[in-house]
Design a protein with these regions (language model features):
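Secondary-structure transition/turn motif
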Residues: 12-24, 29-30, 65-72, 108-109, ...
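Glycine-rich, charged/polar anion/phosphate-binding loops
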Residues: 49-51, 163-167, 218, 238-239
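Short, surface-exposed charged micro-motifs
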Residues: 52-54, 95, 242, 258
């Protein structure tokens, strides 16, 4: 059952729900320590507001899945003369790289969101507990396993929401018109042993980011990620080599450019979309063309960059990112 704002009234520690027998008040079940919980992150933060919610019954208990919304204020990038670089006919792209280890999502604006290693660890914990309950084989164990399965997917779903929210925040802050993701089909080919869970998680993050970004008029697109992890993202370098990347460090063997490998990939994914939007089939992977008369820009952590190499300094601050020395330029 879905509730809108008329049928559900949210308070700090309880919610009032309309039923066929009148309104029912239910208090939130909260842990002793609130730090780091979705309740502390969204309910206690007055910048977030309740939207719609869905009442779900798992055979044992009722759960209320609430959607939170927040309005962001977009920042502008200015060039050295102080002029706004984002005009009505311009296209500004935010590139996003999704990962199975390290940070779950990295954006070309320097946003580092989620912890894929922690996500994988939680997944292993859930699977281990489920295996123990299956071995027990009792009715009580079966009931607990069913309950844990519901808790498990709610946790992962909330985690996908959190990562998507980080991407949305970056996109709005830099005034992006488009957000570029890697096509999921290519992710599966690139990582042949990618578990179904990771495929589900990547798809969920993209879906949540897409519907959240629609509110701001920002369009999501998917691109072919060919060579995005191997190519140097500097606009004056055409080097594409597997030797450029070692773990989470990208070091170009041609020009010496050194940067976080996932950040480099996010930039290349953004450039790939700029190339796609140009409607030219013969644009090389070195991303050296723009979109004709329309001004095309890639949103970076330090400003905006055109495919031709034109740079404008920033007026925004990225969130949740490592130090500049760890990220690079």
């Amino acid at each position: 059952m879905t509730y809108d704002k008329r049928a559900a009234t949210y308070h700090r520690y309880k919610v009032s729900l309309a039923t066929v027998n009148g309104r029912v008040q239910a208090r939130y079940v909260l842990p002793r320590e609130l730090d780091g919980t979705p309740y502390a992150r969204y309910v206690l933060d007055r910048r977030w507001r309740f939207s719609t919610s869905k009442l779900v019954y798992d055979g044992d208990r009722f759960w209320l899945h609430a959607v939170m919304k927040r309005h962001y204020t977009a920042s502008k990038a200015v060039d050295e003369s102080g002029s706004d670089t984002h005009s009505g006919d311009s296209t500004r792209v935010l590139g996003v790289d999704l990962n199975v280890d390290g940070y779950s999502a990295v954006t070309s604006a320097g946003g580092f969101h989620g912890n894929a290693d922690h996500l994988n660890h939680r997944r292993e914990q859930f699977e281990s507990l489920r295996a123990e309950l299956q071995q027990t084989g009792t009715r009580s164990a079966h009931r607990r396993m069913k309950q844990r399965r519901g808790n498990e997917w709610r946790w992962f779903d909330q985690y996908a929401h959190d990562v998507a929210n980080g991407i949305v925040a970056d996109a709005v802050q830099v005034g992006a018109t488009h957000v570029a993701f890697e096509r999921l089909t290519h992710i599966r080919r690139r990582i042949s042993k990618l578990p179904k869970f990771q495929q589900w998680f990547f798809r969920r993050v993209q879906e949540y980011a897409e519907y959240k970004l629609k509110e701001y008029g920002i369009e999501c697109r998917q691109v072919n990620p060919r060579n995005t992890s191997r190519a140097c993202s500097r606009t004056d370098c055409d080097c594409v080599s597997a030797a450029n990347r070692e773990g989470k460090t990208f070091r170009c063997t041609a020009c010496g450019y050194e940067v976080n490998a996932d950040y480099n990939a996010a930039k290349n994914i953004g450039f790939a979309l700029l190339n796609d939007l140009s409607d030219s089939a013969d644009i090389p992977a070195s991303h050296t063309r723009s979109l004709g008369r329309a001004r095309s820009q890639l949103a970076l952590m330090s400003g905006t960059l055109t495919p031709a190499g034109g740079f404008a300094s920033r007026e925004w601050e990225s969130t949740d990112k490592p130090t500049a020395s760890a990220v690079g330029g």
